[in-house]
Regions:
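N-terminal, Lys/Arg-enriched amphipathic/low-complexity engagement segments
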Residues: 42-47
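Catalytic-core signal marking the mid-to-C-terminal active-site face
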Residues: 111, 147-158, 173, 181-250
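Short, charged/polar, low-complexity loop and linker segments
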Residues: 17, 57-64, 152-160
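C-terminal catalytic subdomain
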Residues: 72-194
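Long, non-coiled-coil amphipathic alpha-helical linker/lever segments
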Residues: 13, 17-37
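Charged, amphipathic alpha-helical oligomerization/scaffolding segments
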Residues: 29-36, 40, 80, 87, ...
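Long, structured protein-protein interaction/assembly regions in large complexes
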Residues: 48-75
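Single conserved hydrophobic/aromatic residue that forms the stacking wall/gate
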Residues: 1-12, 16
């Protein structure tokens, strides 16, 4: 079959899978989940969580006993947030797999290394991404349904909101590392495609990535690169550069 810099026609056809073309739809759904979680947290921060609630007036005031302490709205929002971020992480790892697997990468070298058979390239980085996704999947199991009665059954239902918050925090940290690994692989793949150029936004992201992580010429420990780029993902530097190049993504 006729070959091109992007592989044979059959290889190019194999590159088009749901995980590639579905990315905008999945990211859109995840953004909706983030917006909902944020709205619940902001409502809680601006609300009253006391019990009872006191209303002072000239006659001495009144008080109402209720359950404003109940954190279920936030717990549900954070559960949704954890699920959304985990899904984004899994999708990222699957795209990473297509960059590293020479049977799926449309002509890129195996594991994005010049020395296939002698160097591992980014193979072991995928192990890290896979492990982080597996942990996120476990953490995205709901905690809000795990209420245990306490205080002689007076407090017989609680939101488990703090547990959902701690889970979501770890899931987010994992996702930042997974995305960092995918971006490292993406930059490596772009170097192998030179002198071809990508779109303005992609090239802007590439410049930021290469400012922090060098091309993987030979095998080296990648943990420092991953941690450094994960911090860049968290900072929003890549998003800022992309939006400067192509406009707001909202």
């Amino acid at each position: 079959p006729r070959s091109t810099p992007f592989g044979t026609r059959r290889q190019r056809q194999m590159c088009i899978r749901d995980r590639m073309r579905s990315t905008p739809q999945v990211i859109g759904a995840a953004r909706d989940a983030v917006a909902y979680a944020r709205s619940q947290v902001e409502i809680e921060l601006n609300g009253v969580g006391d019990n009872p609630i006191f209303f002072p007036d000239d006659d001495g005031g009144t008080y109402l006993t209720g359950a404003n302490f109940q954190g279920t709205p936030m717990a549900f929002g954070l559960e949704m947030l954890g699920t959304a971020i985990t899904t984004v992480s899994v999708l990222s790892e699957r795209r990473l797999n297509r960059l590293l697997n020479r049977n799926l990468s449309c002509g890129l070298p195996a594991f994005l290394t010049k020395g296939a058979g002698m160097f591992s390239g980014m193979m072991l980085a995928q192990y890290t991404a896979g492990a982080l996704c597996c942990e996120a999947r476990i953490l995205s199991a709901p905690a809000a349904t795990g209420s245990i009665p306490a205080a002689a059954d007076q407090e017989d239902f609680v939101s488990m909101g703090m547990t959902t918050a701690l889970k979501a925090k770890q899931i987010l940290k994992n996702a930042q590392a997974v995305l960092a690994i995918e971006m490292m692989a993406g930059a490596q793949a772009m170097d192998f495609r030179r002198p071809l150029k990508a779109g303005k936004g992609t090239e802007a992201a590439y410049e930021v990535i290469r400012k922090h992580v060098a091309f993987l010429e030979e095998d080296r420990p990648l943990h420092a690169d991953i941690n450094r780029l994960a911090a860049v993902v968290e900072s929003g530097e890549i998003l800022e550069a992309v939006e400067k190049a192509i406009g707001k993504l909202d």
